[in-house]
C-alpha cells in the first residue's frame, strides 16, 4: 500500500515576498510532499503590486529554494482559504508566526477555518530568529524612505520595489 501524499498550502498576500516568507516555505517543504504557495488577491489590503506581479516574484524566489524533495507550486487564489486548500487536496495549511500579535489573528483564523472544515489542520511555524521581525509592510516603508532592504527580500524583489518607488516618485 502506498503512503498517502502529504499536501499543504501556504497562503499569503506576498506584497512583496520576503526572506521571512521564503524561510517558512523552505521549512514547510521539509514536512510535506507537495506544497502549494497560494498568492491571495486580497484587494482589501491595497497591494503595491498586482496579483500577476506578486505571483511572478514568488515563483522566481521559490525556484531558487531547496525543495527537500517536495514539489512546490505557486498559484493565485481569490476564494476562501479553506476552499482553496480543499481544491489543492491539502490536509494542512501552514502559517508563520512572528510575534504575539500574529498569534491572536492566526488563532482566530484557525478557529474559523476549523469550523469550515475540521479535516484540514493549521500548522504554525515560528519565524526563525533571523526573520522574526521582517514584514512586507516594514520592507515597503523602509524601501520607500530610502533604507537598505537587501537583507529582507531576494535581490529580484528588491529591484522591483526600488523600480516601483522610483516610478511613484516620478509620477507624484
UniProtKB/Swiss-Prot annotation:
Site, Transition state stabilizer: residue positions: 21
Chief site of localization: cytoplasm
GO molecular function: ATP binding; pantetheine-phosphate adenylyltransferase activity
Subcellular location: Cytoplasm
SUPFAM superfamilies found in the cross-reference section: Nucleotidylyl transferase
Cofactors that this protein relies on: Mg(2+)
Catalytic activity: (R)-4'-phosphopantetheine + ATP + H(+) = 3'-dephospho-CoA + diphosphate
This protein's record includes keyword Nucleotide-binding: yes
Documented EC number(s): 2.7.7.3
Top-rank taxon: Bacteria
Any one Gene Ontology cellular component term annotated for this protein: cytoplasm
InterPro entries: Cyt_trans-like (IPR004821), PPAT (IPR001980), Rossmann-like_a/b/a_fold (IPR014729)
Pathway: Cofactor biosynthesis; coenzyme A biosynthesis; CoA from (R)-pantothenate: step 4/5
Residues engaged in binding ATP: 13-14, 21, 96-98, 106, 131-137
Amino-acid positions noted as binding substrate in the UniProt annotation, renumbered to this chain: 13, 45, 81, 95
Pfam families for the chain: CTP_transf_like
Purpose of the protein: Reversibly transfers an adenylyl group from ATP to 4'-phosphopantetheine, yielding dephospho-CoA (dPCoA) and pyrophosphate.
Subunit structure: Homohexamer.
HAMAP family registered for this protein in UniProt: PPAT_bact
UniProt similarity note: Belongs to the bacterial CoaD family.
Name of the protein: Phosphopantetheine adenylyltransferase
Species name: Rhodospirillum rubrum (strain ATCC 11170 / ATH 1.1.1 / DSM 467 / LMG 4362 / NCIMB 8255 / S1)
Gene: coaD
